[in-house]
Amino acid sequence: MSRVGKSPVALQGAEVALSDERITVKGPLGTISQAANSLVKVVNDNGTLKFEPVDESREANAMSGTMRALVANMVNGVTKGFERKLTLVGVGYRAQAQGDKLNLSLGFSHPVVHQMPEGIKAETPTQTEIVIKGINKQQVGQVAAEVRGYRPPEPYKGKGVRYANEVVILKETKKK
């Protein structure tokens, strides 16, 4: 059995609804749903969820760990939420959150407007910082990657959009 799949998931005040096709987790921040896999049996045991493979196949063992990780992220999302921080490095690079849109000034001849998907919020504590928040870990990471993709950090000066904890290794310029 998968090492990850063996450890149970504590619900931490979230409610879980189990059916044959879906697992739905409801918490103070919202509700999130995930398709259930037929190779994994999910058991609700007094505030903890246990994931057991239906048979001893490699695929069922692997899927038990995958389902456990996905549901653990769902529980964390509806109780605490996820966030990803981005910083803008460069002269004139600015960000401004307006409702469900993120306006970026990244040195192009036009402003870049990124539409936030439903359930994801963007905040700009300063003009050069962006905080992307939501209950779905995958969606938060995807939106952060899309925003970074508009102007990834370049290797000579390090200008661009980068994750807050990202280290950009700078190249040396060509010498005569």
Swiss-Prot record:
Provide an example Pfam family for this protein. Answer: Ribosomal_L6
Q: Which domain of life is it from?
A: Bacteria
* Gene Ontology biological-process entries: cytoplasmic translation
Looking up NCBIfam families in the UniProt record yields: L6_bact (TIGR03654)
| InterPro entries reported for this sequence | Ribosomal_uL6-like, Ribosomal_uL6-like_a/b-dom_sf, Ribosomal_uL6_a/b-dom, Ribosomal_uL6_bac-type, Ribosomal_uL6_CS
GO MF terms on file? rRNA binding; structural constituent of ribosome
The coding gene here is rplF
HAMAP family (UniProt xref): Ribosomal_uL6_B (MF_01365_B)
Sections of the chain in a coiled coil: none
Give the family per the record: Belongs to the universal ribosomal protein uL6 family.
Its name, as the record gives it, is Large ribosomal subunit protein uL6
Keyword check for Ribonucleoprotein: yes
Keywords, A to Z, come to: Ribonucleoprotein, Ribosomal protein, RNA-binding, rRNA-binding
Could you tell me what this protein does? This protein binds to the 23S rRNA, and is important in its secondary structure. It is located near the subunit interface in the base of the L7/L12 stalk, and near the tRNA binding site of the peptidyltransferase center.
Its quaternary structure? Part of the 50S ribosomal subunit.
Q: Provide one Gene Ontology cellular component.
A: cytosolic large ribosomal subunit
